Amino acid sequence: MLEITGLTRSYGAHLAIEGVNLHVDDGELVTIVGPSGCGKSTLLRCIAGLLRPTGGQVVLDGTPVTGVPDGLAVVFQDYSRSLYPWMSVAGNVALPLRARRGDREKPGRAARRAAALAALESVGLADTAGKYAWQLSGGMQQRVAIARALACDPVLLLMDEPFGSVDAQTREDLEDLLLRVRAERDITILLVTHDIDESVYTGDRVVVLTRGPGRVRAELTVDLPGPRDQISTRELREFARLRGEVSRLVRERAPDATGRAAG
């Protein structure tokens, strides 16, 4: 599905990520965590084709990524800036279908509306189609942003801190929504988050990056029984163990080539 090899990106003299290697299988939900400034968002933007890497390669379904690939969708943290206030909720969700690129056939108006309504249904917002984004709560607006990504029927969904701007209860609701949508659509998801609990709760695998420049420090398999829920899953001993291990890896500086802690 997704193969990242030796990915490096610099901004002038500043090296953001260096030598990142990562493989993601079809249908997998992989979470990425790391210290602030470690290049998590830069990595995601390189994968999405929004940034050209300084070195290395991203391959999606056997094709090198040299621009924004067809079959990929991105959900960002700042949902308020990504939704047009003068368009209806359904219009916002259908908008990317009007600009579809690549080999996929561009759907007609009726097909676009049907896809938008189906996507809104999948995130529990079927009754908001005729409303405007500014009439919705922050959590509902982020659901609209997720629906817009799903309407494109992507093979890969990239999410950059998508729940970072909502309250704790809404965040948990959106985490559960993500797990449900993933199960229903069998979609591959790469989720960047600063929340360690979220990375373990939602992920099949947690990728921990080092302090900048970001490199892959560790990959932890999350083997928790399903279906997961916010109470019983978080009370499991294995959840606590994984959470502690990820937290330790994020806090501690990675050893350098001599085996000593860098910095």
Kindly label every feature range from the protein language model:
Residues 132-136, 140:
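Conserved ABC ATPase signature
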Residues 33-35:
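The feature captures the beta-strand-to-loop junction immediately N-terminal to the Walker
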Residues 151-155:
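A short, proline-enriched helix->beta-strand linker immediately N-terminal to the Walker B motif
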Residues 101, 107-128, 180:
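Conserved ABC ATPase "signature" region
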Residues 48:
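Helix-to-loop junction immediately C-terminal to a conserved catalytic motif
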Residues 56-68:
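Conserved ABC transporter NBD signature motif
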